[in-house]
Swiss-Prot record:
SUPFAM superfamilies the record matches: CNF1/YfiH-like putative cysteine hydrolases (SSF64438)
Protein name (Swiss-Prot/TrEMBL): Probable chemoreceptor glutamine deamidase CheD
A single MF term (Gene Ontology): protein-glutamine glutaminase activity
Role of this protein: Probably deamidates glutamine residues to glutamate on methyl-accepting chemotaxis receptors (MCPs), playing an important role in chemotaxis.
Native source species: Ralstonia nicotianae (strain ATCC BAA-1114 / GMI1000)
Length: 233
């Protein structure tokens, strides 16, 4: 288990937890939408904490003392928090596989841009400040069967780093690429992150979910992509 930092912060009165999917806007990504009413809450006995699973194509932003948990193969996840207020969130996404330009304006790159911007926007809505953000990124492994030659994981990892660089947002820590799936545990209220490397055969169900997500992305990216969202602070 790899641990990425821990820092206690004062707690203040905050808005309610925000939950939604990062499955794009109407049209292009409609088939990816997860029900906003569905929840993935559970009690994690290993860490004795209330926890919330974040599945492929989703994000979760919270002001509560929750642990956010996801399993990553080729997908990437940004764990972002306001280090003064303890507001934080996590996303889980990948770029659609396309034989196209790597321009930030290409359809697949716009998908990744949206996945990052919707998380940041929801954090700002909850009260987070850009200048107080602490960002750690994970995933991008070469694990999806039949997709290794496309360097899907590497492409995802490079995208998230380039997006943050272009936005002027520093990366506090990262654990990207390699060939092993990862299980990521993130506690926004403290900043503590634990990463467990998994054996591929031991996480078949999670990777199957990611493979289905990749297939849906490939089919839906043909629709007209949404325009870039505007960030606000």
């Amino acid at each position: 288990m790899i641990e990425f930092g821990k820092k206690a912060v004062p707690r203040a009165a905050m808005p309610d937890t925000v939950r939604s999917d990062s499955g794009m806007t109407a049209g292009a990504m409609a088939t990816l939408a997860q029900s906003a009413a569905s929840t993935h809450a559970y009690y994690d006995t290993t860490f004795s904490r209330r926890a919330m699973k974040v599945l492929p194509g989703e994000y979760y932003v919270t002001t509560e003392d929750l642990m956010l948990v996801t399993v990553l193969g080729s997908c990437v996840s940004a764990c972002v928090r306001d280090k003064l207020l303890g507001i934080g969130g996590m996303n889980h996404f990948m770029l659609p596989s396309r034989n196209e330009s790597e321009s930030i304006l290409s359809p697949s790159m716009r998908y990744g841009t949206h996945a990052m911007e919707v998380l940041l926007n929801q954090l700002y809505r909850a009260g987070a400040r850009r200048e107080h953000l602490e960002i750690k990124v994970f995933g991008g492994a070469a694990v999806l069967a039949g997709m290794s030659t496309l360097d899907v994981g590497e492409r995802n990892g490079k995208f998230v780093l380039e997006f943050l660089r272009s936005e002027g947002l520093p990366v506090a820590a990262k654990d990207l690429f390699d060939v092993h799936p990862r299980k990521v545990y993130f506690v926004p209220s403290t900043g503590q992150i634990m990463v467990r490397k998994l054996r591929s055969q031991g996480s078949a169900a999670e990777l199957d979910s990611e493979a289905q997500y990749a297939s849906k992305l490939s089919r839906s990216i043909a629709d007209k992509p949404a325009s870039r969202l505007q960030l606000f602070t």
